[in-house]
Amino acid sequence: MEVVSSLGIRDLPASLSVTTSLNHRPHRSDKDGAPAKSPIRPSRTRRPSTSPAKKPKPFRERDAFPSSLPLHSKNPYIIHRDIQIFARQNNLEVALTILDYLEQRGIPVNATTFSALLEACVRRKSLLHGKQVHVHIRINGLESNEFLRTKLVHMYTACGSVKDAQKVFDESTSSNVYSWNALLRGTVISGKKRYQDVLSTFTEMRELGVDLNVYSLSNVFKSFAGASALRQGLKTHALAIKNGLFNSVFLKTSLVDMYFKCGKVGLARRVFDEIVERDIVVWGAMIAGLAHNKRQWEALGLFRTMISEEKIYPNSVILTTILPVLGDVKALKLGKEVHAHVLKSKNYVEQPFVHSGLIDLYCKCGDMASGRRVFYGSKQRNAISWTALMSGYAANGRFDQALRSIVWMQQEGFRPDVVTIATVLPVCAELRAIKQGKEIHCYALKNLFLPNVSLVTSLMVMYSKCGVPEYPIRLFDRLEQRNVKAWTAMIDCYVENCDLRAGIEVFRLMLLSKHRPDSVTMGRVLTVCSDLKALKLGKELHGHILKKEFESIPFVSARIIKMYGKCGDLRSANFSFDAVAVKGSLTWTAIIEAYGCNELFRDAINCFEQMVSRGFTPNTFTFTAVLSICSQAGFVDEAYRFFNLMLRMYNLQPSEEHYSLVIELLNRCGRVEEAQRLAVMSSSSSLQT
C-alpha cells in the first residue's frame, strides 16, 4: 500500500523530504515523447511603441461605481444609515464603495458612521479595510475627533498593528483615559510577548496623571495573567484598593483570573469569597481557574453550589469548561444530567465546543456507545467533533479506529486542522506507525501548520516512541519559540530511549532558561529520579514542588511518594503520604508500591486493606500493584482473593497483566488446575473485547 493512500490525505510525498516533492514536478511529455514546453514562458524583449499615446478617458461615475449601488435615497442621513447597516452585516466592500461615492460627490460623513465601520473592521480583523476607513476619516477632517481616535487605536491593535495604533495615539494632543484604555486593551490582545509594553504604557499613564478606571486595571490584570507576572499583579491589586476601585465585580473577576493563571489558588479564592453579588461571569472564572490548576473535584463542587444554592444555570462558556472536568473525574452520572440540561435548553446542542465536549465526556468515562451516539446524532458535524471522536477512540485504546477516522473525516469533506493533527500524532506514536506519522508530518508542512509548538511537541513524542531519537532533537533545536511542553517532550524523548541522565541534563538546561517547570514536568523528572535512585535530586525537586504549591495535585504527590519508596527512604514516603490532605486512589497506590519496593510485602497488603476499609475505591493500577506484590511474596491465597474482589465487587475488567500475574503465581505454587481455569477465562474475555 502506498503511503499516500494509507491515510487518505491526498497529494502528500512519501517521506519527510518535502522540498523535492513540492517544488520539483516533471513536465508532461507530448505524444512524440518530446518534453513539453516549460510552464514558465521565456521573457520577450519589449519593443518601444511607435504609436502615439492614447488620451485617458474622462472620469464617468458609472465606470467607478456599480449601477446597482444600494442607495435608498440621496438624502445624506439615509445614506449614512445604509452604510451603518452594511457595517453591522460586516459587508465592508459595499460600505466602502458608498463612501467613495460620497467622497466624489463631496457629501460629508459623520463620526457615528465611521465608528460603525471601524467596529466592523475589528470583527473581521481586516487591517486593509481599516486603513481605508482611516483615510476617509482624514478626508472628512475628523481625525482630531477623540471618540474616533480611540476607535482607531482599538481597531489597529485588534487587527495586529500595534505600531499604527501607537502612531495614532501619539498624534493626539489631549489623550483621555478611553484612548489609553484602547491602547492597553489592544496591546493585551496582541499576545503574551507584549507584557512589558503594557507595563510601560501603564507606568506612563500614571506618571502623566491620567485618572485610572476599572477598565484600565482590568486590562493590566489580563496582561499579568498571560505573563504569570505575580509580583506586578500584587502591586496593581494594592493600587486598586488605594484608588477605591476594588468594589467593582468586573475588576475582581479579572483579578481572580490573574491569580489562577499565576498558580495562586488561595489568593483567587480569597478574592472570590469577598464578592457579595456574584454573577455568572465570576462563577465561570472561578470554575475555569480551578480546572486550569488541576483542581477538578473543587471545580465540580463549585459547579454544584452555583446551581443548587445560587440558582445560576451554566451558559455555553461554563459548559465548555465543566464538560472536560466531568470527563477527567469520570463523573458519568452528573455528566448525563448536564447533557439533559443541554438538550432541554436547545440553545447549546449544536454549538461546536459543547457538542465536542459531550463526545469527549462520554469517551473519557468509557461509554463509547453514548459518545458515538452524540456524534452521529448531530446534523452539523465538523472538524471539531471529528477530532473529539478521534480523541475518544485513542483514550479507550482503539488506536486503529482513531487513525482510520482521519480518512472518514475527509470523506465527509472536512480537512484536518492543527488540533486534529496534534490528536492523531500520539495515536501514530502508540501504534509505532512511523510511516503514517511521516505522512502527517508532510501534510502539516504543506499546509503551513509548522512551526506550531504544540504540533512540534507531538511530532517529537511520536518520533521518539517510534525509535528515531535524532528527529526530536532536530525538531527541538529548530524550534525558536520553546515553551514548557516542548522542554518536557524533550525530557520524555531521552527517557523513552533509556538515556535517563540526558533527560536530567535537559531539565537542568530548562531551569537555566526563562521557562519554569510545571506540575507535569516535575512529575516526569520525579519518575526519572525514581529510576536512577537519585534521592538528593528528588529531595531538591520536592522542595521546589512545595514552593510552587504543586503538592496538592494528586499525580504529583503520588510521584513524590513513589520516588522516596524506590530510593529506599520509606520514612519520607510515609511522611509525604500523611501530608496529603485529600487522598485518592493515586496516593494509596503509590504508598502500597513504596512498601513493595522495599520488600515489606505484608505491610503493603495491610495498607491495601486499610485503603478499602476507609472507603477508597481501588482502580486497575492499584490491583496491578497489589497482585504484583502478591506474586513476588508468594501470597497465592491473597492474590486469588484480590482478583475475585476486582471482578465481583468493583466490576473491573482484568487486563492481560492481571491474568498473567495470578496464573504465573498459581503455577508456581502447584495449583495447576486453577491456573488452567483462569487461562480459559483470560482467552474468553480477550475474545469478547
Curated annotation (Swiss-Prot):
Q: Spell out the disulfide connections.
A: none
Q: Report keywords, A-Z.
A: Chloroplast, Plastid, Repeat, Transit peptide
Q: Which portions of the sequence form the region Disordered?
A: 16-68
Q: According to the lineage, what is the superkingdom?
A: Eukaryota
- Protein localization: Plastid, Chloroplast
Q: Name one GO cellular component term.
A: chloroplast
Which GO terms fall under biological process for this protein? RNA modification
Please list the residues that make up the transit peptide in this record: 1-49
Q: Give GO terms: molecular function aspect only.
A: mRNA binding
Return the NCBIfam families for the record. PPR
What the record says about family reads:
Belongs to the PPR family. PCMP-A subfamily.
> What's the protein called, per UniProt?
Pentatricopeptide repeat-containing protein At1g71460, chloroplastic
